[in-house]
């Protein structure tokens, strides 16, 4: 998989860098693993905006991804590597020995025809899922559970991974993609390897229209709003008149907003800002 740059034939492609999709092996998704995806425009069930600057975009269908990897001991063959519009990573279509089909995140190096397995007896090989207690130190992981049986929550974006640093009692020490060191129970499952499509971070949309295609609207600065719409709005000229704040008056640009004394604090050995 690589990136494609364009000659400046038009203003829209002058700076555009996009994926060439050369690693995909199938164009149409598996129909049995699709569910409808209704757009919300950033609104909740009360109709109130909970995420600003969302709306429009191309219609999508959601691909059901197996984050739990709970078919223990049943081998599966990689049937295809596909595009997923709902995430930055590619997805792999698995066909299990009993005939069931599932999607998983496609790690770097996984190819069509490979066999993957979940369980304590699985080999340390890209695409296999094992409990942390059965994985050697230093291994790069993705799709890591926070609680046993909850399904993978950590390291699911394109090109990211966790590293298993140590094991102490009932907990394993993981280095997160952010650099944070965190304890996770050793019974939690994780998948071997780094999430594929690592060139995603180097893509450049090149024009505002491509941002609208994915459902993002222009992000308006508070300083150019009216006083009724933002604490920093109004005034003569471009003066802020105060420290930068969010639309709800909370200080921003470096202000720490994480609530203190959370129950999960005991699992964080080193914060990401202490690296």
Swiss-Prot record:
Keywords: Ribonucleoprotein, Ribosomal protein, RNA-binding, rRNA-binding. GO terms for cellular component: large ribosomal subunit. One of its GO terms (biological process) is cytoplasmic translation. One of its GO terms (molecular function) is rRNA binding. Signal peptide: none annotated. SUPFAM superfamilies: Nucleic acid-binding proteins (SSF50249), Translation proteins SH3-like domain (SSF50104). Residues 236-263 are annotated as: Disordered. Pfam families: Ribosomal_L2 (PF00181), Ribosomal_L2_C (PF03947). It comes from the Bacteria. One of the primary rRNA binding proteins. Required for association of the 30S and 50S subunits to form the 70S ribosome, for tRNA binding and peptide bond formation. It has been suggested to have peptidyltransferase activity; this is somewhat controversial. Makes several contacts with the 16S rRNA in the 70S ribosome. Part of the 50S ribosomal subunit. Forms a bridge to the 30S subunit in the 70S ribosome. PANTHER family: LARGE RIBOSOMAL SUBUNIT PROTEIN UL2M, RIBOSOMAL PROTEIN L2. Belongs to the universal ribosomal protein uL2 family. HAMAP family: Ribosomal_uL2_B (MF_01320_B). NCBIfam families: rplB_bact. This is Large ribosomal subunit protein uL2. It comes from Pseudothermotoga lettingae (strain ATCC BAA-301 / DSM 14385 / NBRC 107922 / TMO). The gene is rplB.
């Amino acid at each position: 998989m690589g990136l494609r740059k364009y000659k400046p034939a038009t203003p829209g492609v002058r700076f555009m860098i996009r994926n060439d999709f050369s690693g995909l092996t199938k164009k149409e998704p598996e129909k049995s693993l699709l569910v409808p995806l209704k757009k919300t425009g950033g609104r909740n069930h009360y109709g109130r905006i909970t995420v600003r600057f969302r709306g429009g975009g191309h219609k999508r269908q959601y691909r059901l991804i197996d984050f739990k990897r709970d078919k223990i001991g049943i081998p599966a063959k990689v049937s295809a590597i596909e595009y997923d519009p709902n995430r930055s990573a590619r997805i792999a279509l698995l066909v299990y020995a009993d005939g069931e089909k599932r999607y998983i995140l496609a790690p770097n190096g996984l190819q069509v025809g490979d066999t993957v397995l979940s369980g304590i007896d699985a080999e340390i090989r890209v695409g296999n899922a094992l409990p942390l207690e059965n994985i050697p130190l230093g291994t790069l992981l993705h799709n890591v559970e926070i609680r046993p049986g909850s399904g993978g929550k950590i390291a699911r974006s394109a090109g990211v991974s966790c590293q298993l640093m140590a094991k102490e009692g009932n907990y394993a020490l993981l280095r997160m993609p952010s650099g944070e060191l965190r304890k996770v129970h050793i019974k939690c499952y994780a998948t071997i390897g780094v999430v594929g499509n690592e060139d995603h971070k180097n893509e450049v949309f090149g024009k505002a229209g491509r941002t609208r295609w994915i459902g993002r609207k222009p992000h308006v600065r508070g300083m150019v709003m009216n006083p009724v719409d933002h604490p920093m709005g109004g005034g003569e000229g471009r003066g802020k008149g105060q420290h930068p704040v969010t639309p709800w008056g909370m200080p921003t640009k470096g202000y720490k907003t994480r609530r203190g004394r959370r129950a999960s604090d005991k699992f964080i050995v080193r914060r990401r800002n202490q690296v």
